[in-house]
């Protein structure tokens, strides 16, 4: 129906543009493509994959089966698949039909990063399919023909030394890399595939080796951790005279001894069909058994290998002997529409960098940016409504600084657990005076936690399996929820039992109780950011984009250094997200340059401009910094030689030792400077554009001499030299350097900074004057370097650096910072005509939105899920506003009342139990209804006897058929849904019917405890002196006599609406006028009387709702037979008639509302003039407590004082 309605509009647009859809299907496909543009692109690339489900580290090196896999993430299918090879069929299909993003660059970049570049070796000995090739003599590769060369990995790569086992990659992977390398990357063809149904099968030698073969052979554990090697040759089996042929014959298994028998082959037609369908993957079936090749792939028990068809699949299982022996091409596939966990993994857990976890599989990327891209696209698919809903992002920053009170025995380390889940560990450090770590850890995408536990361990000797637990420190999360990090000493807790005390005492070397107990110095901060829907920040974003310069000028004097850094970081990220980073930085920096008196003090102070530039370089140039200085820093830290050249710090040393240190320092500085010069092409274009704009602005002001100083202060003083001085703060290394290495890095950074400042050593540092020779020699190269990074590239277009920014989180942080800093003095200073005059109103609006449980302006549904995306579930149960009930559409704009058919004596099966439909038994007359007696006054107080499963708050009810069960029912397609009992309308029932809408109002009224008006309650509120919307019965039922008395309120109106008490905000429901051709039965003007009250209590289909109020049933009107509600009826009437009808309905509604308001004002004045009270009886006007609030024209009746006016 939606396609039919949109089709004429689309055709008109295409006619205007000169292009018309040839067929309706082409228009439909066009709309589908437009909708698919909102989905994340297809991401694919090589990753290091671990298919396991580890629980903890066990204080030892984790041994998991890491291997290289070609991963494909398809957002349309919501799947994450992993393959052994990069198939041309998959790559070609994605490139031609979908938007794709290559995450790893290319195969050669992946291989170079992980040290998997191929080497040429002669053919290995012929072995069986389940044996391992050994090392042998390798003749020079120049003397071998191409077809006899053998590609393998001779050793574990340097970047994979922390992996316990790394699976081998196929020969085709290295063959393709070799071709790309030799041809300069011009060949982009696919890899040769095996003969199991894939086109382009290769001929010749095809071998897969294990990356850890050499390491396992050297350590004598070849058979325990090494994987199998499969060798297949094009010809028959040959025996080569090689030194390791004896091992191959010993370990090989002949074919006739294999217990698997070869069956008859399937027909050619079935075989071709199976090969054609081989590209499609089956879903994960948790009920099937693990793969037969579990020793090779270590599949978790809950996985089914994708080489086996699904239980209900259409493909037949392959029955050939060769297929059972060989492994499948695809290792696993994860469906993202299940309850999966996605979160980053700290590198200290598995000693694997840039790792993240999805379900029970771990993936390791090349760079942090690559991991951020993978996770961002996965999060968008798992939670597509993230920017349209309220959410909470939790993060934690913790520093493990040092420990004292420990004996000088072996090394110590700490493990950090959040709610008994291990997240990270420190390095092992030996005690000097104190055990100093100085390591910081940042955890993102955290769930809501209660406590942080830091456990202190001491490494044991090689004979023991486990390390010794010294003690632990437990910190409540409420102690860390502050604006700035909390730093203090924490006493290490030990066990209170006798055995525990003796164990701790023995671990501490038998210390007496009089000695100092161990303690840890920890600094930590817990941050929980509450984020509104993204469109709620439109006014704030507009203010920031148009008035960021006056805003920074006003906040500069009132912020401290820490606040400046936080605000500048968030501002830079928001401007980068909206492509305004260059203008923002240039305006801010030039404003500071204009105020600067001394050019030599450029970027020396801690201002918003310097902090913003520093944050921008960290955001876009993180990969550049890692590729430039990471290897150099690690080399310096591995060397224990000192570069100290100050004779006062060295003491009595010989001249030869001093000259040796000078030569080592000179060599280090030259290596660092050379790496910076050689990597100038990797500097991001975003940063070059900023430097180029700054140079152009200075040249326009005739201050060209200041350009080099400004640019060198930015790149060296704020980025490169601080990274050399403190590499752990820039994530170049994880450990804090030793005192000797820290001094070496300080001298290196000091020399490069003097070169960037174009100044020589002397005066206060005479011991560094020997480096003036280096400064003079590299002076002109520094000028050339600064000119190159601040000029447009002439080699061609360059790509901008990518960065993942959460705009909602940053805008929420900016709002928080402004609320703290925007004082009344600043608001008074910025008058009405000032550009910042609306800052206070914008902040007040956001504060009001955050304070309320929901906002009717944005109509953003709350999603019942964890506070962050740590546990994402795409099958989210959307809760409208703050109620814990499903959302349904309001009545369509036809003006008709819905009439139920014959009674089925049970709720409708297609409706949820929280729906607000009335059973047909409600329309029975009092004479026909069983037990039709009058409802007593105690009916309104029967809520004290309601079921425990009934709640009147907006909190999640775990003891009822909650939304989680509803999600399960929806996931099962509605099968096996639990039938809930109906309520009875008799007075003896302990549960009274209600509308099924919940309340946050703590005060329970006898009239209604609902704070969100239901459709029936709104109709009842409008029914006061309104014959159209009245809840009276239809013409087929008896009409009660006119009441003898009318109840009015005695005392004055209650206090006005207080949001602190009624912290709800409902969405006004649309009220449609009844068409004129519908026959509406007459009704009475009042609701008093025995029979009237008896008919007003209606049985509902919602047993969970509160039952302490009586409600009026909706009006029942006679719908003519010729009233057609189908789409054909509206289509035939024409657009003009339909529009005129809508306008008439709106006008009639407006007139009806105005009339109701006038009558309600008159009724209010009469109620205020009455003086008599009612002792025992009360009357229900049909309007709920919330209906009075919604109309804003009626006052709540009093529970205690009511007056009666005689007729």
Swiss-Prot record:
Feature type site, description Arginine finger: 604
Taxonomy, superkingdom: Eukaryota
Primary residence: cytoplasm
Residue numbers spanned by region Disordered: 1-29, 221-316, 495-516, 856-903, 923-1013, 1086-1107, 1163-1207
Keyword annotations: Cytoplasm, GTPase activation
Pfam families: C2, PH_RASGAP, RasGAP
CDD domains reported for this sequence: C2_SynGAP_like (cd04013), RasGAP_DAB2IP (cd05136)
One GO molecular-function entry: GTPase activator activity
Expression (tissue specificity): Mainly expressed in gonads and vulval cells. Isoform c in expressed in pharyngeal epithelial cells and several rectal/blast cells in the tail region. Isoform f is weakly expressed in four cells symmetrically located in the vulval region. Isoform g is strongly expressed in the pharyngeal muscle cells m6 in addition to several cells in the tail region.
PH domain ranges (all copies): 40-383
Residue spans of biased composition, Basic and acidic residues class: 955-972
Composition bias type Low complexity, residue spans: 223-236, 939-953, 985-1013, 1181-1207
SUPFAM superfamilies, per database record: C2 domain (Calcium/lipid-binding domain, CaLB), GTPase activation domain, GAP
Domain C2: 374-490
Annotated InterPro entries: C2_dom, C2_domain_sf, PH_domain, Ras_GTPase, RasGAP_CS, RasGAP_dom, Rho_GTPase_activation_prot
Ras-GAP domain sequence ranges: 579-789
GO cellular component terms listed in the entry, alphabetical order: cytoplasm
Signal peptide: none
Compositional bias of kind Polar residues: 237-247, 286-297, 495-504, 862-876, 891-903
Subcellular location field: Cytoplasm
GO biological process, one term: negative regulation of Ras protein signal transduction
SMART domains cross-referenced by the UniProt entry: C2 (SM00239), PH (SM00233), RasGAP (SM00323)
Role this protein plays: GTPase-activating protein, which acts as a negative regulator for the member of the Ras family let-60. Probably decreases the signaling activity of Ras by stimulating its intrinsic GTPase activity, thereby lowering the levels of GTP-bound, active Ras. The different isoforms may play a distinct role in specific tissues.
The protein's name: Ras GTPase-activating protein gap-2
Organism expressing this protein natively: Caenorhabditis elegans
Gene this chain is encoded by: gap-2
């Amino acid at each position: 129906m939606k396609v039919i309605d949109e089709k004429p509009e689309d055709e008109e647009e295409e006619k205007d543009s000169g292009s018309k859809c040839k067929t309706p299907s082409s228009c439909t496909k066009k709309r589908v493509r437009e909708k698919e543009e909102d989905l994340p692109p297809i991401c694919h690339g090589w990753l290091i994959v671990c298919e396991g489900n580890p629980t903890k580290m066990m204080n030892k090196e984790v041994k998991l089966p890491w291997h290289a896999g070609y991963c494909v993430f398809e957002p349309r299918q919501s799947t994450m698949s992993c393959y052994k090879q990069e198939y041309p069929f998959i790559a070609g299909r994605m490139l031609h039909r979908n938007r794709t993003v290559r995450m790893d660059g290319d195969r050669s970049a992946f291989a170079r990063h992980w040290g998997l570049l191929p080497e040429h070796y002669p053919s290995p000995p012929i072995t069986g399919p389940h044996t391992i090739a050994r090392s042998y003599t390798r003749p020079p590769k120049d003397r071998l023909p191409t077809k006899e060369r053998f590609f393998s990995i001779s050793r574990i790569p340097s970047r994979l030394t922390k992996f316990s086992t790394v699976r081998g990659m196929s020969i085709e992977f290295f063959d393709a890399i070799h071709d790309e390398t030799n041809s300069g990357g011009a060949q982009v063809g696919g890899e040769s595939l095996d003969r199991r149904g894939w086109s382009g099968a290769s001929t010749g030698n095809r071998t897969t080796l294990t990356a850890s073969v050499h390491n396992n052979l050297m350590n004598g554990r070849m058979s325990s951790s090494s994987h199998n090697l499969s060798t297949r040759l094009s010809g028959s089996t040959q025996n080569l005279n090689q030194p390791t042929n004896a091992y191959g014959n010993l370990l090989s298994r002949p074919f006739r001894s294999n217990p698997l028998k070869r069956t008859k082959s399937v027909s050619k037609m079935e075989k071709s069909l199976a090969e054609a369908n081989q590209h499609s993957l089956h879903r994960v079936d948790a009920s099937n058994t693990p793969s037969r090749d579990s020793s090779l792939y270590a599949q978790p028990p809950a996985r089914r290998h994708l080489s086996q068809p699904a239980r209900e699949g259409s493909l037949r299982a392959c029955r050939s002997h060769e297929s059972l022996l060989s492994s499948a091409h695809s290792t696993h596939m994860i469906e993202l529409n299940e309850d999966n966990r996605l979160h980053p993994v700290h590198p200290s857990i598995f000693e694997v960098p840039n790792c993240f976890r999805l379900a029970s599989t771990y993936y390791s990327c090349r760079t942090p940016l690559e991991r951020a891209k993978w996770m961002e696209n996965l999060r968008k698919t798992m939670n597509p409504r993230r920017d349209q809903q309220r959410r909470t992002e939790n993060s934690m920053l913790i520093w493990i600084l040092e420990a004292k009170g420990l004996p000088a025995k072996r090394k110590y380390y700490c493990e950090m657990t959040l709610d008994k889940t291990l997240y990270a560990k420190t390095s092992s450090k030996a005690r000097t005076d104190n055990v100093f770590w100085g390591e910081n850890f940042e955890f993102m995408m955290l769930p809501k936690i209660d406590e942080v536990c830091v456990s202190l361990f001491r490494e044991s000797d090689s004979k023991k399996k486990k390390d010794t637990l010294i003690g632990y420190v437990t910190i409540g999360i409420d102690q860390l929820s502050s604006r700035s990090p909390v730093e203090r000493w924490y006493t290490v807790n030990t066990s209170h039992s006798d055995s525990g005390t003796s164990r701790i005492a023995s671990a501490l070397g038998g210390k007496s109780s009089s000695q100092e107990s161990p303690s840890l110095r920890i600094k930590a901060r817990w941050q929980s950011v509450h984020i509104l829907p993204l469109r709620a920040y439109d006014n704030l974003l507009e203010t920031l984009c148009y008035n960021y310069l006056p805003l920074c000028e006003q906040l500069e004097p009132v912020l401290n250094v820490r606040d400046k850094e936080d605000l500048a970081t968030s501002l830079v990220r928001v401007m980068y997200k909206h492509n305004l980073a260059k203008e923002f930085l240039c305006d801010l920096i030039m404003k500071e340059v204009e105020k600067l008196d001394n050019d030599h003090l450029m970027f020396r102070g801690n201002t918003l401009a310097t902090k913003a530039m520093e944050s921008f370089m960290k955001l876009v140039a993180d990969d550049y910094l890692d590729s430039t200085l990471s290897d150099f820093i690690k080399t310096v830290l591995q060397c224990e030689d000192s570069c100290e050249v100050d004779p006062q710090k060295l003491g009595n040393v010989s001249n030869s030792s001093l000259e040796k240190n000078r030569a080592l320092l000179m060599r280090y500085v030259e290596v660092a400077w050379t790496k910076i010069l050689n990597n100038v092409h990797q500097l991001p274009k975003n940063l070059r554009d900023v430097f180029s704009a700054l140079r152009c602005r200075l040249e326009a002001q005739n201050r060209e001499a200041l350009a080099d100083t400004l640019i060198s202060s930015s790149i060296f003083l704020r980025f490169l030299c601080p990274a050399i001085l403190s590499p752990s703060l820039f994530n170049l290394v994880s450990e804090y350097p030793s005192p000797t290495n820290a001094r070496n890095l300080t001298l290196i950074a000091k020399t490069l900074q003097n070169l960037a400042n174009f100044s020589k050593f002397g005066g206060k540092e005479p011991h560094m004057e020997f480096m003036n020779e280096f400064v003079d020699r590299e002076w002109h190269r520094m000028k050339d370097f600064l000119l190159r990074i601040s000029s447009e590239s002439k080699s061609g277009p360059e790509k901008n650096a990518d960065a993942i920014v959460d705009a909602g989180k940053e805008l929420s942080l900016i709002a928080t910072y402004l609320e703290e800093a925007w004082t009344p003095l600043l608001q008074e200073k910025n008058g009405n005509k000032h550009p910042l005059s609306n800052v206070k109103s914008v902040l007040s609006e956001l504060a009001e939105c955050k304070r309320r449980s929901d906002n009717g302006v944005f109509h953003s549904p709350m999603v019942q899920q964890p506070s962050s995306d740590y546990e994402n579930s795409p099958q989210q149960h959307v809760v409208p506003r703050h109620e814990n009930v499903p959302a349904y559409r309001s009545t369509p704009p036809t003006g008709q009342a819905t009439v139920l058919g014959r009674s089925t004596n049970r709720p409708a099966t297609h409706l949820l139990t929280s729906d607000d439909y009335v059973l047909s038994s409600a329309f029975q007359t009092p004479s026909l209804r069983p037990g039709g007696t009058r409802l007593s006054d105690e009916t309104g107080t029967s809520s004290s006897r309601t079921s425990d499963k009934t709640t009147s708050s907006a909190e999640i009810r775990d003891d009822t058929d909650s939304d989680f069960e509803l999600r399960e029912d929806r996931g099962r397609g509605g099968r096996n849904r639990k039938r809930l009992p109906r309520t009875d309308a008799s007075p003896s029932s302990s549960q009274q019917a209600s509308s099924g809408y919940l309340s946050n109002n703590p005060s329970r009224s006898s009239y209604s405890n609902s704070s969100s008006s239901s459709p029936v309650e709104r109709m009842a509120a409008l029914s006061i002196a309104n014959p159209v919307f009245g809840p009276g019965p239809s013409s087929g039922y008896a009409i009660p006599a006119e009441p003898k008395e009318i109840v009015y309120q005695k005392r004055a109106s209650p206090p006005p609406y207080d949001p602190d008490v009624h912290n709800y905000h409902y969405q006004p429901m649309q009220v449609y006028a009844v068409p004129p051709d519908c026959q509406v039965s007459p009704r009475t003007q009042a609701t008093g009387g025995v029979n009237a009250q008896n008919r007003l209590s209606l049985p509902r289909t919602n047993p969970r709702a509160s039952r302490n109020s009586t409600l009026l049933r909706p009006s029942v009107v006679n719908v003519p037979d010729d009233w057609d509600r189908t789409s054909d009826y509206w289509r035939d009437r024409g657009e003009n008639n339909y529009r005129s009808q809508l306008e008439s309905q709106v006008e009639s509604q407006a007139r009806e509302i105005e009339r109701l308001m006038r009558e309600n004002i008159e009724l209010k004045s009469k109620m205020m003039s009455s003086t008599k009270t009612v002792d025992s009886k009360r009357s229900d006007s049909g309007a709920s407590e919330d209906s009075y609030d919604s109309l804003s024209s009626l006052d709540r009746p009093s529970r205690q004082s009511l007056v009666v006016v005689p007729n």
